[in-house]
Amino acid sequence: MTGKPSDVNQPATAGAVSKGVIFAGYLGGGTIKDCGLADFGTAEDKPPYWAHLDRSESDAQNWLVRESGLPSAALHAILAEETRPRLESFDGGGLLLILRGVNLNPGADPEDMITLRIWAEEKRVISLRRFRIMAVQDVRDQLEKGQGPSTIGGVVTQVIGGLLQRMEPTIQSLQGCGLRSCACDVTSPLSVTP
């Protein structure tokens, strides 16, 4: 790959799914070594691996269903059109996160939330999006500079941190528009009338 990578579909190595792969590679030393999905696996002798996919692309969906090895319940949740934010753990150590963030893409309304779906295991993380997620791009940029995470937990933590950081100004503006006046005092006793 030449030039600075961006959050667009990048070609994968020969024999791999190329349409729908935004980036995929091995983590190590704060960097990512691009290799596409051809070399993706769960072998213990391989370094941690991160694949970021466009979930709207049928090639990416087919790869997930046929080759990723994700449990069927996780596949159903990660590929669903309608989702809710959640965290689920699976036997064998897998973790499914479905997160929401503010849509800061050009021309978008920040109130239109974007969804990031993450499957994380000890040695690999698969993230999926439909619309560009700047928090993911930030982590990718840090990896390109050699200053990124080297572990799966580090990737997930930094992506979540980026989502939260970008949500803060929108939340602050909502608080300034009267959100505080809608809050209830959770320390006072409830009064229920039949």
Q: How would you describe each model-predicted region?
A:
Residues 1-194:
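Peripheral, non-transmembrane regulatory/ligand-interaction domains of membrane transport proteins
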